[in-house]
Amino acid sequence: MRDTLYANVPFQLNEMAHHYGANVHLVGNPFLLSQLATLCAKGTLQPQINRLVEQLYTDLVKTVINAEFPRKMVTLPTRMIDSTPLGIYQGEVVDPQLRVVTVNIARAGTLPSQVTYDLLNFTVDPSLVRQDHIIMSRMIDAAQAVVGSEIGGAKIGGDVDDAFVLFPDPMGATGGSLSTAIQLYKTKVPGRARRIITLNLIVTPEYLRRMTTEHPDVIIYALRLDRGLSPPEVFGTAPGLLWDKERGLDDRQYIVPGGGGFGEIMNNAYV
């Protein structure tokens, strides 16, 4: 008889209470929030910026794997099997026969998607893991305000049938780019995804409104909600309770307090 201690491994996500719906998860993690605060600070520069992005996404992807990915029971001989027939581990692991696609939305999503891809290759069967690439551009008006998004090009390796499709994109500002990319996968890429999940460092109420309206089936994981331009009566209330009054975007569609344009700072675009 084997020990059944790990036959059903519990995992409970630590998340902030809110009123945005069951598919939105605002991860409550003091360590990651500390790292994110450093990442967004004015004096933080390269190479620390990209190092922090790597660390944050490594932990965020692990959180999503723990919370969302299916598991299976395994019986695996350990190195002690040569000494005793009891040298066998039996318990749950992440199902290695899971198909997963991570989507790089360039530029800001390039490093997060690579981190996600590398970690997935060590978690499930690498032959079932794929990374796709989308070139996305913001459309701006004469006042430099964002008015939309357009796809400039894409490298999509195949279908997404029964796959977990992950979109690691640091800043959920307007939701325009992600919504457009997700719509592309829903309408142009063959197959029906098993689950679509976005992984964001920071999101705004406006982003959540758009995503939950246009893609109510999509699951959202974020480390922080920024609503810094909301009226005073919003502060101190539970996120989403006064959703219509919450505001996290300035007139140029940048997040406040935010951390600036991540596509720029991650690539030293100002040099």
PLM feature spans:
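PRPP-associated nucleotide enzymes
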Residues: 1-271
